[in-house]
């Protein structure tokens, strides 16, 4: 598997597999394989999270993760704390031109 690392931080990395033509987002103990279209959609989902809204919602959970991201799998929601969300943004908020550099 020939992976080009696009971005990396303490929580994970975003890479591109030339062999399979997919982006690989590893984040803590999560691996998500995304097509170009799926990465663009995920980018928009992450970008549009209303941080102020979710910060003000009382969280009675023992794990203090306030920021949910719904997935297409009905019974799976990814949850992040503020620092994890910022790290996730750092990985997936790449420009259109940078993304296209890898797929062309």
State each model region's role:
Residues 1-104:
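Positively charged, low-complexity terminal tracts
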